[in-house]
Amino acid sequence: MSNNIHSPTVFVVQDPDGKEITLAAKYGKLHVILTGKESTDVALNKLHRVLSEMKPGDYLLPIGKSINMGIAIHFAWHYLKINSLCNPVDLNILVWRREQYEYTVETIKL
């Protein structure tokens, strides 16, 4: 009998370039999408392809160039709507809380 339980993924928009993100791993497996060196067109295509795998229960860690974060949030919302059987859908965004030295979840109902 197979186990169909979804293990959460933390989709990290861009390589953190020296910033510490390992604390986000408590929410799921870290998957860094972009290096930050891609052109906007290449970044758009890669974000589109990778975030098509996003499912309810996954997380988005928006870090990096503003345009890449905006595109990532758009695709995350789009694919969560497609990949979810629920309506509305929750988009889980990880936010760094400097004072507490931890990531917390901000959930947006879509």
Regions found by a protein language model. Give the residues of each.
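Long, low-complexity, Lys/Arg-enriched
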Residues: M1-Y59, H74-L110
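Glycine-rich beta-strand-to-loop/alpha-helix junction loops that act as flexible
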Residues: I63-K65
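Short, well-ordered alpha-helical microsegments
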Residues: N68-I73
